[in-house]
């Protein structure tokens, strides 16, 4: 572009002080020729459009051939800043329409040479390299003394034309557009990332996507390394962020049984249960494994929960001495029998155990004298008072149980109404539930009152074997320190329960369930 320039004056002296506004380095005039624009004149003279308009008292960008313009070159006030995003794209011009030159890592120090009208900065980085970045992703400014002479960088000639600048300004008004293209993560106060870390403990606000960006791993890899079936993570969860740590990150079955908050971590997100009384509020956290059907790969497969029996237990023995922490369910599981059989062998009427008790765990249940001459009312087969029935002491009349056909149908129908509703700790319904809140609510709709916690519900029911279990019975699970979960049995090995994925069907023998199954209870 050819222009006629006539030097008018040169400043006699320049006063430069730290933190002062830019000072005039020299002054000249140019005569506008056909085809000239303010933007082109500014580029040729090492200044900006705003400086030209201010020096010549222009209110628009319109100029005409023959017009004389005063041009002032400015000594830029250089500022040292650092990249506040995780990664920041450096472009060839001031706007997202320009090509990406490189990307700078968070914390990289740069020198701001100038600021454009759209908020973008021309920067110097590395060994004298220049480019443009969005100024909103620079922070920690340290102001240096102004340079004595103006620098016009060659890269400035690659700036877009004024019409493109206007387009860029519109885009900058939409933060999402810039965020997606130029800053991987825009947290200005993010702590330094340990790039050598192999695991990460989840904190409030963390997401799988944020961790993938932070550690440079894909979301798919993180989910694979941690056996996650969804992108849901929870505070305190230990996440492998490098493949080398994948085998060591399955949450351990760790039980903390101290009151008032008992928390167990096995292989899945937390399921918690709240107990409310009129005078106090006791919080009980129940943690389950991933609730999934038998056709789903569950995170529980990767967990190595501590086995219930101690390694020294002789499973061939016919008796067992009760130790601290034992339950009938755990003992039954150890010796391959059922709770009801152990109770029958030992004449137990409740599930309460005392440390030191010696229990029979194998043998034949003694026959019961079933002569009904003294108890004719137990005869359910005919009207002859001399007939015998089996086990008259056990009343199997299902009309006296909540599990009879009509009651069971009503209970299951009520449970099905809530399929898909959300889980919440302490949820009593009808919009959200925890496990025992769900069973309490469903039974209450049929006029049956249950205790509020799963442990209390287990204690209040009559225990039945799986072969005796009927739809409408309760099914209980123990993860190592007592009853921790309850669902409503619907038959065929299925239950409806409230767990961390909401109210849903689950296979009681499926992955993450079968190894923790204690047994069934009838209300």
Swiss-Prot record:
* GO biological process terms, semicolon-separated: proteolysis
Q: Which residues form the active site?
A: 435 (nucleophile), 485 (proton acceptor), 497
E.C. number, please? 3.4.-.-
* Entry superkingdom: Bacteria
Major enzyme class: hydrolase
Assigned keywords, A-Z? Hydrolase, Protease, Repeat, Signal, Thiol protease
Return the Low complexity bias intervals. Answer: 157-167, 251-282, 290-318
Q: Where is this region: Disordered?
A: 146-188, 251-323, 367-408
Q: Where is the signal peptide?
A: 1-27
User: Where does the SH3b domain start and stop, copy by copy?
Assistant: 78-142
Write down the InterPro entries for this protein, in alphabetical order: LysM_dom, LysM_dom_sf, NLP_P60_dom, Papain-like_cys_pep_sf, Peptidase_C40, SH3-like_bac-type
Q: Which family does it belong to?
A: Belongs to the peptidase C40 family.
Q: PANTHER family annotated for this entry? A: MUREIN DD-ENDOPEPTIDASE MEPH-RELATED (PTHR47053:SF1)
- Its job: This major extracellular protein may be involved in the invasion of non-professional phagocytic cells by Listeria.
According to its record, what is known about the domains? LysM domains are thought to be involved in peptidoglycan binding.
The name this protein carries in UniProt is Probable endopeptidase p60
Organism this protein belongs to: Listeria seeligeri
């Amino acid at each position: 572009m050819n222009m006629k320039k006539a030097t008018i004056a040169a400043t006699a002296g320049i006063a430069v002080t730290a933190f002062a506004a830019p000072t005039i380095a020299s002054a000249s005039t140019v005569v506008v020729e056909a085809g000239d624009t303010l933007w082109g004149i500014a580029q040729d003279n090492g200044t900006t459009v705003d400086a030209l308009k201010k020096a010549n008292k222009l209110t628009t960008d319109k100029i005409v051939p023959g017009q004389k313009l005063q041009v002032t070159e400015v000594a830029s006030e250089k500022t040292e800043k650092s990249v506040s995003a995780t990664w920041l794209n450096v472009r060839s011009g001031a706007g997202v329409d320009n090509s990406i030159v490189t990307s700078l890592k968070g914390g990289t120090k740069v020198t701001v040479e100038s600021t454009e009208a759209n908020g973008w900065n021309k920067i110097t980085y590395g060994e004298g390299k220049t480019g443009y970045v969005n100024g909103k992703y620079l922070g920690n400014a340290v102001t240096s003394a102004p340079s004595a002479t103006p620098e016009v960088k060659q890269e400035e000639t690659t700036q877009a034309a004024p019409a493109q600048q206007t387009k860029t300004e519109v885009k900058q008004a939409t933060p999402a557009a810039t965020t997606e293209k130029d800053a991987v993560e825009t947290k200005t106060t993010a702590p330094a990332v340990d790039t050598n870390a192999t695991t990460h403990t989840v904190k409030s606000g963390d997401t799988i996507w944020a961790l993938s960006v932070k550690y440079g791993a894909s979301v798919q890899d993180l989910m694979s390394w941690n056996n996650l079936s969804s992108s849901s993570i929870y505070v305190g969860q230990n996440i492998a962020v490098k493949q080398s740590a994948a085998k060591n990150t399955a949450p351990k079955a760790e039980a903390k049984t101290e009151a008032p908050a008992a928390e167990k971590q096995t292989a899945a997100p937390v399921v918690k249960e709240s107990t409310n009384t009129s005078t106090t509020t006791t919080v009980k956290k129940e943690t389950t494994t991933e609730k999934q059907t038998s056709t789903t790969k569950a995170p529980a497969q990767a967990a190595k929960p501590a086995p219930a029996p101690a390694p020294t237990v002789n499973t061939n023995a016919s008796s067992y001495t009760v130790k601290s922490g034992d339950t009938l369910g755990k003992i039954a599981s150890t010796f391959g029998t059922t709770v009801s059989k152990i109770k029958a062998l030992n004449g137990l009427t409740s599930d309460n155990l005392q440390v030191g008790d010696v229990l029979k765990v194998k043998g034949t249940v003694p026959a019961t004298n079933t002569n009904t001459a003294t108890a004719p009312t137990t005869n359910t087969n005919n009207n002859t008072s001399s007939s015998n029935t089996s086990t008259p002491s056990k009343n199997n009349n299902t009309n006296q149980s909540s599990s009879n056909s009509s009651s069971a149908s009503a209970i299951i129908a009520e449970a099905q109404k809530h399929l898909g509703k959300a889980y919440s700790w302490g949820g009593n319904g009808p919009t959200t539930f925890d496990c025992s809140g769900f069973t309490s609510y469903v039974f209450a709709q049929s006029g049956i009152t249950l205790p509020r916690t799963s442990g209390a519900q287990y204690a209040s029911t009559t225990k039945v074997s799986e072969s005796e279990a009927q739809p409408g019975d309760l099914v209980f699970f123990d993860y190592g320190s007592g009853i921790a979960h309850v669902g409503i049995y619907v038959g065929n090995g299925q239950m409806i329960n409230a767990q961390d994925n909401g109210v849903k069907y689950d296979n009681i023998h499926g992955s993450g369930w079968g190894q923790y199954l204690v047994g069934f209870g009838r209300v």
